[in-house]
Amino acid sequence: MVREAWDRSRNLLTRIAEAVGADVPSELSLVSFGSLARMEFTSESDVDWCLLVDGRADANHREVQLRVQEALHGIAGTKDPNPAGAFGALVFSHEVIHCIGGAQDMNANLTRRMLLLIESVELNDPAIDRPRSRVLRGILQRYFEEEPRFPEKQFFPQ
């Protein structure tokens, strides 16, 4: 069962990269989360994904999102993410990195940030310094390097 899910995941990652990799410009990362990122994809799994933008917003990003969505529809064995959920969308790095806690940190943003950290995979060429790696560094910097600048704010409660 585990080996079957691993093989199914590896196969699907390859098919997605072949189907959409060339359509994703270098300022975007096509990122998958959940069972596909954990290499546990089954016939019941959906494909949770986002297009991660780190930089200037561009009207063309929406077109890329629609092409990715269409390409994923064409890959046998894939199900769309929950339409009311946090996936299948454009995600902007500024919100993920800087809206931590408080009223601006909505459930979808928190979900994306946590899953980026613990279970995400780049679906396009990871050799290029894509937004995913920069955003991961940015999140970790916010969590761990910002604290020394605020000595009254203790990282670990006493």
Regions found by a protein language model. Give the residues of each.
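N-terminal regions immediately upstream of nucleotidyltransferase
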Residues: 1-26, 86-88
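Alpha-solenoid helical-repeat scaffolds
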Residues: 3-6, 58-62
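Active-site nucleotide-donor binding segment shared across nucleotidyl transfer reactions
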Residues: 14-60
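Conserved catalytic core of two-metal-ion nucleotidyltransferases
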Residues: 17-23, 60-157
